[in-house]
């Protein structure tokens, strides 16, 4: 396999760091040390500090008996000085062989001024894992500049909305009434909510799974969504008779009794979204949703427009919030960075990486 990040090879300072640091994957018995680092140097009362269940769901690697974190442990003091957490789809289905890495927490202590310490963690994981794709969603300006320096493809994550235009008042969003009313597409498919058992019964030869990402699998969606410890996701099968053409994976979000539906992942050809316009509208009416939104990278804009999903940036003054824990009524513009050795087109959704992760405990929401 090609090296996904050859720019880090031959860096003398990385080799020299081994004299002072033990750089490796985080052991299970170092959980308390890592969580203390996150709480003290990354974010106070982070969800991983508050919930070991959530941390284990995302980072506990039972296959390798470790956590999916690389740490730099100072040999003299025994303290963690830097950490790099990552998410893989392989984590949710070990049968997935091409490995995609989603960088998550990447932090070096502010008081530690050691050249290349954080970069050395990147070097370690790419030397110890057969990485095909490194993709980061929702990254800081500092991280973005580093990824650009390394030759990553970068850009803005797109945010689309399908409005409920039958409401007189909106609370979660602003100026959604400025979206021009469009003629609805005919519903050529039937949208049916399905549970885990019904999902598992869908044949592997169905069209929906012929369009699945090489980094995901049928089992991945079970482990990632149906077995989530805190969030409740809903699956909608888009059916043509008995055949499943696509599946919408979504989660209800809200604030003070006002609600929306967020499509966090999608299996199949995105053009099929345009074949259930009326049923999506009926769903919004039934559930009192202000809108349905979709955050993505890589889908065809024309296909989403044809499905009557509108890019929020195309409507002046339109505000569609991205943060609900806690709720912030403002637009959020997120960057992405991607580096791959595969020729396959990559499409990402909100639930990729750790973007659709709780920030608060359930009783605080």
Write out the residue ranges for each language-model feature:
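Conserved acetyl-CoA binding element of GNAT-fold acetyltransferases
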Residues: 97-110, 257-269
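Active-site-proximal structural scaffolding
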Residues: 48, 65, 96, 118, ...
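Alpha-helix boundary/capping segments in eukaryotic regulatory proteins
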Residues: 92-98, 112-116
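Beta-sheet entry/capping signal
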Residues: 69, 80-83, 100, 131-135, ...
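Amide-forming acyltransferase catalytic core, primarily the GNAT-like/NAT-type
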Residues: 2-8, 23-26, 30-77, 83-94, ...
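Active-site/acyl-donor-binding loops of N-acyltransferases
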Residues: 2-14, 88, 132-183, 234, ...
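Double-stranded DNA-binding cores of transcription factors and transposases
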Residues: 20
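Conserved acetyl-CoA-binding loop-helix of GNAT-fold acetyltransferases
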Residues: 105-108, 113-127, 271-283
């Amino acid at each position: 396999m090609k090296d996904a990040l050859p720019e880090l090879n031959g860096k003398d300072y990385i080799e020299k760091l081994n004299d002072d640091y033990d750089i490796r994957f985080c052991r299970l018995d170092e959980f308390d040390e890592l969580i203390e680092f996150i709480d003290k140097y990354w974010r106070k009362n982070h969800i991983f500090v508050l919930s070991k269940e959530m941390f284990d769901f995302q980072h506990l690697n039972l296959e390798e008996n470790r956590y999916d974190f690389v740490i730099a442990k100072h040999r003299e003091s025994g303290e963690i000085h830097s950490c790099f957490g990552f998410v893989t789809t392989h984590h949710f289905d070990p049968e997935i062989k091409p490995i995609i890495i989603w960088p998550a927490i990447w932090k070096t202590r502010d008081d530690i001024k050691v050249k290349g310490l954080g970069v050395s963690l990147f070097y370690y994981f790419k030397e110890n894992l057969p990485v095909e794709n490194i993709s980061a969603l929702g990254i800081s300006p500092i991280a973005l500049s580093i990824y650009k320096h390394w030759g990553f493809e970068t850009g803005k994550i797109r945010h689309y909305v399908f409005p409920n235009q039958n409401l007189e008042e909106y609370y979660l969003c602003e100026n959604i009434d400025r979206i021009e009313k469009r003629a609805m597409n005919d519903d050529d498919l039937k949208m049916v909510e399905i549970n885990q058992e019904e999902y598992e019964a869908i044949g592997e030869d169905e069209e929906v799974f012929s369009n699945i990402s090489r980094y995901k699998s049928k089992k991945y969606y079970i482990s990632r969504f149906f077995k989530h410890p805190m969030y409740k996701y809903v699956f909608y099968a888009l059916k043509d008779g008995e055949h499943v053409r696509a599946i919408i994976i979504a989660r209800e979000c809200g604030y003070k009794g006002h609600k929306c539906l967020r499509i966090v992942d999608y299996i199949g050809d995105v053009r099929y979204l345009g074949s259930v316009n009326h049923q999506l509208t009926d769903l919004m009416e039934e559930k009192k949703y202000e809108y349905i939104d979709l955050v993505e990278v890589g889908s065809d804009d024309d296909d989403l427009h044809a499905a009557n999903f509108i890019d929020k940036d195309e409507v002046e003054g339109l505000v569609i919030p991205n943060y609900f824990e806690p709720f912030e009524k403002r637009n959020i513009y997120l960057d992405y960075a991607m580096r791959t050795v595969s020729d396959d087109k990559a499409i990402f959704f909100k639930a990729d990486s750790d973007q659709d992760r709780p920030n608060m405990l359930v009783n605080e929401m």
